Amino acid sequence: MIFQTTSEDTLTKARTGILNLNGIELKTPVFMPVGTRGVVKTLSADDLEELEYSLILGNTYHLYLRPGTSVLDRFGGLKKFSTWKKALLTDSGGYQVFSLNSLFKYEQDGVRFQSHIDGSRHYFTPNSVIDIQRSIGSDIMMVLDDCAPFDSGPERLKQSLDRTHRWAEMSVQYWEKNKNSQHLFGIFQGGIDLDFRLESLNTITSLPFDGIAIGGLSVGEPRKDFIRILDGISAHTDRNRPLYLMGVGTVPDILDGVKNGVDMFDCVLPTRNARNGQVFTTLGKINLRNEKWKSSDTPMDPNCTCKVCKRYSIGYIRHLHHVGEITAFSLSTYHNLHFMKNFLTEIQNSIQKGEFLEIYAKWKNLYEKPEFSG
């Protein structure tokens, strides 16, 4: 077993735990920065270690296309290639393939697609994506699944569940024949139909995965449906395994995920928003492109202890964004990931102290408001 619960909130499903990945221990709930192509944009491995991150995410689709498995095999995996010394999770690449629209085609045992880079043709199967992730050398591998659009009707959702469940069974059989130190997580689907969700959760939970992931949420559905599905499944999840909510990284969404028993999160939003001039602070979201910060000599967040806020004024960082300097992206990204790390630590501490709902209300109030304007 790779997961152990260490404390539980008495009023919600929130909990803390320890996730053990080949000797690397992580406290949960945990947020994973996204390094799609083998790097968290604008940051080095040293930066991530300085920020005390121990788990990041890579993307199988992109790493398969470039640099490719032959390069990864030669280096002994992505971690040696990139000198990342901590843990790595890779998604299966299925979501990216299905986002290609006309460039992919379902088959019984996989999906054919054309590269978005050069139009070359490729074929992903449940087995092949495990092989690719073995070349990548991730500590957690994700199975190939079929994520239907959130507004799909019953027929399309049924197709999604049938594929997802069939591919999950194939993945488990293949993985168990050639087990190594890599862990495998299953993914359940069902869109915003709670009956389909519970059916899929039951099927995926019945298989011997190391962890269970919620797929196909936060893909454009109304927020009330996002909350409804989380609430509806929370009483039915396996509390002996880690629960991973894929692609979720806003402050309100993380809070609602934790409230409903989620242990793991990933999202490009903190890094992407940083590059677009939005930073997360203890006062709320701030738009660095706002004219009002032009001459401000205060830090982006007066309560922040990161090296960026200790050294630079918000006026200076706004200037760097305004003139398009690359350094603006790295400084803002560093700050946002520092914020996320502290935010998750505060959540962990609040659960252990029995104060989660107080923290929940505090951050919800701050982050469901418009941007902070001083």
From Swiss-Prot:
SUPFAM superfamilies per UniProt: tRNA-guanine transglycosylase (SSF51713)
Class of this enzyme: transferase
Record's catalysed reaction(s): 7-aminomethyl-7-carbaguanine + guanosine(34) in tRNA = 7-aminomethyl-7-carbaguanosine(34) in tRNA + guanine
GO molecular function: metal ion binding; tRNA-guanosine(34) queuine transglycosylase activity
Pfam families recorded: TGT
A GO BP entry: tRNA-guanine transglycosylation
Note accompanying the cofactor annotation: Binds 1 zinc ion per subunit.
Top-level taxon: Bacteria
Active site: D91, D266
Residues noted as binding substrate in the record, renumbered to the chain: D91, S92, G93, G94, Y95, D145, Q189, G216
Cofactor(s) recorded in Swiss-Prot or TrEMBL: Zn(2+)
Pathway(s) of this molecule: tRNA modification; tRNA-queuosine biosynthesis
RNA binding as annotated region, ranges: 247-253, 271-275
Binding site for Zn(2+): C304, C306, C309, H335
Keyword Nucleotide-binding: no
Record EC number: 2.4.2.29
Keywords from the named record: Glycosyltransferase, Metal-binding, Queuosine biosynthesis, Transferase, tRNA processing, Zinc
TM segment ranges: none
Its biological purpose: Catalyzes the base-exchange of a guanine (G) residue with the queuine precursor 7-aminomethyl-7-deazaguanine (PreQ1) at position 34 (anticodon wobble position) in tRNAs with GU(N) anticodons (tRNA-Asp, -Asn, -His and -Tyr). Catalysis occurs through a double-displacement mechanism. The nucleophile active site attacks the C1' of nucleotide 34 to detach the guanine base from the RNA, forming a covalent enzyme-RNA intermediate. The proton acceptor active site deprotonates the incoming PreQ1, allowing a nucleophilic attack on the C1' of the ribose to form the product.
Entry similarity comment: Belongs to the queuine tRNA-ribosyltransferase family.
Cited NCBIfam families: Q_tRNA_tgt (TIGR00430), tgt_general (TIGR00449)
UniProt subunit comment: Homodimer. Within each dimer, one monomer is responsible for RNA recognition and catalysis, while the other monomer binds to the replacement base PreQ1.
Protein name listed in UniProt: Queuine tRNA-ribosyltransferase
Protein's organism: Leptospira interrogans serogroup Icterohaemorrhagiae serovar copenhageni (strain Fiocruz L1-130)
Source species taxonomy: Bacteria, Pseudomonadati, Spirochaetota, Spirochaetia, Leptospirales
